């Protein structure tokens, strides 16, 4: 499982949705999305949407994944956060870096 954490964290840096990490784990175990969803007691649609990158990892799902894989909920939520940050950087990064910072802020004189 430590290999899962290391490999997943490295891949997260490359704009990979956490569902891809989950898909890889399920493939290695030979487990279908339907069987996995039964194991963690969630609707199959939730798992398939995560696997397709169409649904985010929520707190509830992170707890279930952590329990099943012997990781932490924070691990799964961090993968989701890293993914979302990478997407935001791609979409708005340049505009955000052009904004003032506390060091460059000049109060308006009234």
Features from the language model and the residues they span:
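A short, Lys/Arg-rich alpha-helix, primarily the initiator
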Residues: 5-31
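The alpha-helix within a helix-turn-helix
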Residues: 26, 37, 66
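The DNA-recognition helices of helix-turn-helix-type DNA-binding domains
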Residues: 43, 54, 69, 80-83
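Short, charged recognition helix plus adjacent turn
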Residues: 67, 77-110
């Amino acid at each position: 499982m430590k290999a899962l954490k290391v490999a997943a964290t490295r891949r997260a840096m490359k704009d990979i949705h956490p569902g891809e990490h989950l898909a890889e784990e399920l493939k290695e175990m030979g487990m279908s999305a339907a069987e996995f969803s039964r194991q963690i007691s969630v609707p199959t649609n939730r798992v398939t949407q995560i696997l397709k990158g169409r649904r985010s990892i929520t707190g509830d799902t992170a707890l279930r994944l952590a329990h099943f894989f012997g990781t932490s909920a924070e691990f799964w939520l961090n993968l989701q956060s890293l993914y979302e940050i990478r997407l935001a950087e791609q979409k708005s990064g340049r505009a955000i870096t052009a904004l003032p910072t506390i060091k460059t802020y000049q109060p308006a004189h009234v």
